[in-house]
Amino acid sequence: PQPWWIEGEGFLHLFTKYTGVRELYWSRSPDGRQWSADRKLAGIEGHYQTSRQRGSRVVTAFNRHPEGYPDRRTDLYYLETTDLGESWQTADGAPIEPPLVEPHNAALVREFDAEGRLVYMKDIDLDAEGNPVILVVTSGDHRSGPAGAPRIWTIARWDGTSWRFGEVTRSTHNYDMGSLYIESADHWRIIAPTEPGPQHWGTGGEMALWVSDDGGDSWRLEREITRNSAFNHTYARRPVNAHPDFYAFWADGDPFEFSPSRLYFTNREGNAVWRLPEVMESVLEEPILEE
C-alpha cells in the first residue's frame, strides 16, 4: 500500500491486489474513512511499483512479471496523475486509458526483457524541473550468488523529450534496497547497501552514501555509513519530508538464518548511525549512537 495525501483534495491510494497475480490498483478518499471503488491501473501479468507525490501530482514506476512469475520481473513502465487518478498520462503527456494489459504500450520506459535483464524497483523522485527519475537494480538472474552479476544500480531519467539511463554502481543482491534524494538541480544522493557485507551473497550489505554533483550523470562513493557489521543492512527508506537528522531508516539481519534484527537511522551526511533500543524500558527511549 502506498497512500498519498493531496492537500485540499484527499488521499490517492496506490496498492497491489493478489488476484492470482500481482495487479496494480488505485482508490481515493476525501478523509481516509470513505473510499471509492478500487480501479485497476495495470494487469500485464503482474507488477511491483514505487511511487512519489509532489503537490497534486503522483508518479509511479513499475515492472511486469511475465506469465505472473515475479522471478522473471522485467521491463520498466511509468505513469502519472494530477487529479487523484481521474486521468493518467505518460512522461511526455500522452493520455493513457487504464488498465494497461499489453506489454508494449505508451507507458513503457525500456524493454529490459529484450536485453535479458530483470528489473527490481527501488525508488522514484522528481528532479528540479519536475521530470521523473527512477532508481532500479537490473540483474541477469533471480537467484542469489554470482550468476546474476552484474547487478547494476541504474538511473532512468526523463529529460523532457526522452528517457536517459546511467549506472550508479553495482551490487551483490537483487534485493539490495535504497532510496534516492534529489535535493537540487545538480545535487542528488542515494543511500543504499551497495557495499559487500558479512553475508556476501545475501540480501543487503554495508550501507553507503553515493553523491552526484551533476544531476545524476556521474556518481561517487561519498561515505561508507556502516563498516565491519555483524549482519547485513538493507531496505534504507526515505521518510516522507525527511528531516536532515532522520534521513534514512533501515534494518539489519542475517539473510541466511534466524538472527536478531535491529532498526537504524542516519542523518543527511551519513556520518553517524543511531540504533533504536531493542527493549523499551519506558514510553520514551533515546536512540543509541553506534561507535
Residue ranges and their predicted role:
Residues 1-291:
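Extracellular, repeat-based ectodomains that mediate carbohydrate processing or recognition
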